[in-house]
A protein has these predicted regions:
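Bacterial N-terminal signal peptides
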Residues: 9-17
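Metalloprotease/metallohydrolase-associated module, dominated by Zn2+-dependent proteases
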Residues: 24, 147-151, 155-172, 183-186, ...
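Generic detection of long, well-ordered alpha-helical segments
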Residues: 85-90, 227, 231
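Positively charged n-region of N-terminal signal peptides that target proteins for export
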Residues: 1-6
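Metzincin-family zinc-dependent endopeptidase catalytic domain
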Residues: 88-193, 199
Length: 241
């Protein structure tokens, strides 16, 4: 009888141990989303003007969200200033601040400069400049988001601004004391505020009446309006966080 009891106890211990091992979560598969920011289409037929569409306004409440998100509302990021115009880091910080100041509980924390560039899954979040024309012809900027496919949690985000394009801090703002202004440039803060929306997984909007929202999908030279979030941008971030 003693041997039988011992055997039963051992069997129960092994069964319990096996149950713990089997309960370990399976490895998560990682997938990615690529957001490509293109210039405003030019030429005849570039836009469709609906006869009864409402006029574009920053009070438009539209937004697009896929369900992918950060596990916690705290995101650290680095900036590679190589190839960027002077004072770009301050402009980029202001871009993230626009979302941090919106409804919702998202916190962005600047961790300083880095030499890392490009888009690599290294579990670090980086803004850099690089020539992306070959891979993304005509693109102003590209943001790549890696995430766990099963639980839809973000693990890494990188934005690359196209170094082949003209960039300036305060683009289009003419200094009255200077002979020339910054006309004919993409504004760093304007474009990066849009890209920061992708860091939070808000998608691009292309409807006619969304042109004055930050998440409108096209960018333009000397444009500044994306620096300030519209109603739909704020509603989107408030829903996620």
């Amino acid at each position: 009888m003693k041997k039988i009891k011992i055997g039963i106890i051992i069997a129960l211990v092994l069964s319990f141990s096996y149950g713990i091992t089997a309960a370990k979560p399976a490895p998560q598969e990682i997938d990615k989303v690529v957001f490509i920011h293109y210039p405003v289409p030019q030429g005849q037929g570039a836009y469709w003007f609906p006869a009864k569409a409402p006029a574009p306004t920053d009070q438009n409440t539209k937004y697009k969200y896929s369900g992918i998100h950060w596990a916690v509302p705290y995101v650290e990021y680095l900036v590679n200033p190589s190839g960027a115009p002077p004072e770009s880091e301050s402009a980029i910080n202001a871009s993230f601040d626009a979302w941090q100041s919106a409804p919702g509980d998202i916190i962005f924390e600047y961790q300083g400069a880095t030499s890392i560039s490009g888009s690599v899954l290294d579990y670090g979040n980086v803004v850099s400049w690089g020539n992306i024309t070959e891979d993304y012809p005509g693109a102003i900027a590209v943001t790549v988001v890696w995430y766990y496919r099963g639980i839809k949690e973000i693990v890494d985000v990188d934005t690359i601004m196209n170094s082949g394009d003209p960039w300036a801090v305060n683009a289009g703002v003419v200094d009255p004391d200077a002979e020339t202004g910054n006309a004919g440039y993409y504004d760093v803060q304007n474009i990066m505020t849009h890209e920061a929306g992708h860091w939070l997984m808000l998608g691009d909007l292309y409807q006619w009446d969304t042109q004055k929202l930050t998440m409108y999908g096209y960018g333009a030279l000397d444009e500044l309006r994306k620096r300030t979030l519209g109603a739909g941008d704020k509603l989107g971030i408030d829903r996620i966080y």
